[in-house]
Amino acid sequence: MAFALLFSSFFFYYIGVPTPALLLRCGLSASLRFSPRAALALSGVAALCGDGAALVARGGLHAAPAPARARLIPVAFAGGTLGRSLLLMFTAGHTGSLPLLRLQVIPLLMLCLLSLLPARAGAWPKRAHGPAAFRALCFFCGIVDGFFGAGGTLLFSGLWPQRIERRRFSSPALPLLLTVCAQAGALLLTACVGASQVFPVQMVLMLGLGSALGALAAERQREHGAFWRGAGIALRVYLLLCALSGMEQAYLV
């Protein structure tokens, strides 16, 4: 199982799947060996290691502008903690993994569709881009990351225009920093309430190592490698079909 987690997390991050942590959570929660809360904890480890490694590859904390970094970190951490607390309350009222799967197939479908759309080229009104709007967007994306396990990066990249206030707010490292902060708060809360399962250290290390290596390899191929970009698009289409199939099975059982 440890090597299966290593290879699956590596290739999910390497090929450019838009929501690798969410896919890992779906697979783990579908397995009878893991409880829903255990799947949340393991997918949080994968997200934290993978996005953290990608953030380091893009320059770390210093790659993000200081004003944006100071505003983003606390609200993203709080949003991730709030989102995970809502999810834990949901899982506490249900037994088994089927309710969690039903909750995840819809955002998985929406995120796959969002990744297929072209980047947002328009711009919002100038007055909508103050510090308060930036904090609100980071808090909302943090809640999405903590509740669904993924999606904050895609939402932030799609909703926040990159042309406005570029010096203060825009940076390719900001979406990754948002996910790392949100996942840190979510994983800390999950660990505090108990993961309902004791994981072997080897399993957790293999999962984190696979996610980190996959993210680093993807960053090296980001500027070149048309084959892997095409493979990523093909895999997104395949995951879209899988999400549709999962939705059909989850809601028609």
What residue ranges belong to the model's regions?
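Short hydrophobic/aromatic, small-residue-rich stretches within specific transmembrane helices
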Residues: 43-47, 175-179, 203-204, 208
